[in-house]
Amino acid sequence: MELPFLSVAALLLGAGFTLVIWNLACTLWSARPLALPARFVTTGLAAVGVAVTLGMIFALVLEQTATGSAFVRIHSGALPIHIIAGLGGWLTVTTMGVSYRLLAMFMLAPDIDEKRNRVTLWSASAALGIAVAGGFVAVLAQV
């Protein structure tokens, strides 16, 4: 199967996501100290970075631009990590953070910064970190 511009598309898409992440990260950096919803968004941005990086590796290996053994192992076994980072990290955690902000805004109530919400953030971040790191260790340890 010939995919003539897949690696170019992957690199352009990766560059686009990098610019978006950089733009949002600069905005968040200037807004320090971060409110709780912004911390959720920061975790989501880290997760989308992982998902995009894995997607680029998938495309580069599929077109045979990247042929290293580590890249091939990532291509063959890292799809669950890609899904966890994309759906669990980027979409879910970012949506939770935005929901915390929007709920307070539409109810005309003050922002809630309860211990329970911080525990939710730390639990979600820890679960994502363990899943992604453990997944990489498992994939790269394959012989």
What does each model-identified segment do?
Residues 1-143:
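Hydrophobic alpha-helical transmembrane segments of multi-pass integral membrane proteins
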